[in-house]
Design a protein with these regions (language model features):
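Stable alpha-helical elements in mature extracytoplasmic
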Residues: 35, 39-43
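Polar, low-complexity export/assembly segments characteristic of proteins
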Residues: 1-36, 48-168
């Protein structure tokens, strides 16, 4: 793709992207790109600079894989609201592999148990059941974490928690 500089003024390089359910304005590439890194940076800047997306704090990270010659777009949001899709892509964008058919995998809310009780997942945060001994505790799962079998976490209140309960 980048054996020679890509001059996007010669064709229509435009698209719309939906991030977490919000559709952008029409985004158009209008420069000459000597490397994939230049185009990756420009795509990320144009998408994250879009007024509609900025208005709802929706943003993406754009990456380029030299081995496959493809760009990837990852929402910075977490959980099941995290989605990325394209629409209104021009033929020139489709020739680069960015087309209306390109739909990302929807994110998932974290799931798990605390002290053997099913927690409530909201994005990357796992919360204990309301009123449980662990109430007030929250666990944040880092981006890219994946389960390799079962993970168990047990919780016990410390002396301060016990004293607080006695004072109430």
């Amino acid at each position: 793709l980048f054996d020679t500089p890509l001059d996007t003024s010669l064709e229509d390089y435009s698209f719309r992207i939906s991030v977490n359910g919000t559709r952008s304005n029409l985004i158009t590439l209008s420069g000459t790109y000597n490397t994939a890194e230049e185009m990756r940076a420009e795509l990320q800047s144009l998408i994250n600079g879009d007024e509609r997306l900025k208005g709802v704090n929706a943003a993406v990270d754009v990456a380029y894989d030299d081995a496959t010659g493809q760009f990837s777009f990852t929402s910075r949001d977490y959980g099941k609201t995290s989605t990325v899709s394209f629409s209104g892509t021009s033929a020139a964008m489709a020739n680069m592999g960015i087309s209306d058919d390109l739909v990302g995998t929807q994110g998932k809310d974290v799931q798990g148990t605390i002290n053997g009780v099913k927690g409530f997942g909201a994005g990357e945060v796992l919360l204990p059941e309301l009123g449980s001994d662990a109430y007030g505790l929250n666990l944040t799962v880092r981006p890219g974490a994946s389960s390799q079998g079962a993970f168990t976490m047990n919780f016990s209140q410390g002396v301060s928690g016990e004293l607080s309960g006695l004072i109430e």
